[in-house]
């Protein structure tokens, strides 16, 4: 899946899993430079579903590392977090892990949907599982629901930024910044 390209609404723009990893790791580098626990907490929250798509076990480990900030020096937390983040991001997301993430997201608003809307959601999910639509297509269908219920937590998830078909122009402005950063080396 390394070379798999995720298609966006504009077919001229494509993003690879390598681009996803580089983006997340570059944002972590920003956290390291800030040397602030609040930025690490924000990073962890914003990347929860992205990391979950890659490695749910490491997501839990990362959460525990962040939670230990009162017991361990921040520099040690950053070093341990970085190691586990790299492990998580190396693992390729699968249909199963994306489905798990999408179901977790669905849980945020499912009780507010009508039966017809729920049925439509599960039809999208089935199309995704049958490989008839891409991850981005499912997320771009979910995105308006998130805004309808004003769920800022979900709207701020990098999972939507990097996989959704909704706003590829913004994504590529962000990813173009990686070219100015050069190779990202977190060792």
What are the residue ranges of the model-derived segments?
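Acidic, Ser/Pro/Thr-rich low-complexity regulatory regions
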Residues: 2-187
């Amino acid at each position: 899946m390394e070379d798999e390209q995720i298609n966006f609404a504009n077919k001229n723009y494509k993003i690879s899993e390598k681009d996803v990893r580089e983006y997340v790791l570059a944002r972590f580098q920003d956290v390291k430079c800030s040397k602030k626990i609040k930025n690490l907490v924000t990073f962890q929250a914003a990347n929860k579903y992205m990391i979950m798509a890659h490695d749910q076990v490491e997501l839990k480990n990362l959460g525990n590392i962040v939670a230990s900030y009162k017991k361990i020096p921040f520099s040690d937390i950053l070093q341990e977090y970085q190691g586990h983040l790299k492990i998580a991001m190396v693992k390729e997301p699968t249909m199963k892990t994306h489905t798990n993430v999408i179901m977790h997201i669905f849980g945020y608003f499912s009780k507010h949907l009508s039966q017809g809307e729920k049925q439509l959601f599960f039809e999208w999910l089935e199309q995704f599982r049958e490989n008839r639509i891409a991850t981005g297509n499912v997320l771009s269908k979910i995105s308006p629901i998130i805004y309808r219920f004003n769920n800022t937590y979900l709207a701020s998830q990098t999972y939507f930024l990097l996989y959704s078909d909704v706003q590829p122009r913004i994504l590529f402005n962000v990813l173009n910044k990686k070219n100015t950063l050069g190779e990202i080396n977190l060792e």
